Amino acid sequence: MKLKNKFALLSLCGLMLSANLMAQADDVSPQRKQAIDSLALEKVRDLSKYISIIGNKKTAFSEASRVMDRAEELFAPGSEMGVSALGREAVIYFPIRKYFERLNALNYDRVTIKWYNIHYISDLERQPDGRYVGVVTIYQRFEGESDDGLKYKDTTKKDITIYVERKKTQIEGRTVEFWDVLLGDIRVTETTA
């Protein structure tokens, strides 16, 4: 098992081990919140890597499809990704899978996508339905270049909605509650050269 998968499994186990304590309390303890925040930021960083792989023109289609499947698992159902461009005021929103497919099919010979300055801009807040919602901001640097000299570059500031909710699973015949983190809509807030 790869180190990353082991870490993810250990993180999940850690979240599940505290489920009994969490089930007794309505609020998330500061220690648990810190673990949830770390998991949320890890999922955002994973998405950053997946987007770079999907957009890379050297990635085989079969590999890109596999990575799209993995990336989709990070999101809550119905989530959308905003897409902007310099010289166009409107932001267009696509369902997550459609965004990945369009990214993979961009008409450039070389594409580089880097995310940086990833941080929370709002604390997790409890919602009436019992889940918690927060927002993570990222900056995305996009560079596309064609062999015929066509070049496009922009930097986009994006806000990612983070959902944290209690879920249940069966482990050795026992029902165990745990906190899960899912990504939601990714909204464009600013696009610059």
What kind of feature is each model-predicted range?
Residues A23-R66:
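Short, low-complexity N-terminal intrinsically disordered segments enriched in polar/charged residues
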Residues N20-D26, A105-Y116:
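Short, charged, low-hydrophobicity "junction" segments
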Residues H119-A193:
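Exposed beta-sheet edge and beta->alpha loop/turn motif
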Residues M1-P30:
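Bacterial Sec-dependent N-terminal signal peptides
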Residues I53-D69, I113-I118, R174-L182:
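Short glycine-rich, low-complexity/disordered patches
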Residues L47, I51, F75, L103, ...:
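Hydrophobic, Leu/Ile/Phe/Ala-enriched alpha-helical segments that form helix-helix packing faces
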Residues A64-T112:
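Short solvent-exposed beta->alpha transition segments
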Residues K6-L10, A71, A193:
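Intrinsically disordered and other compositionally biased segments
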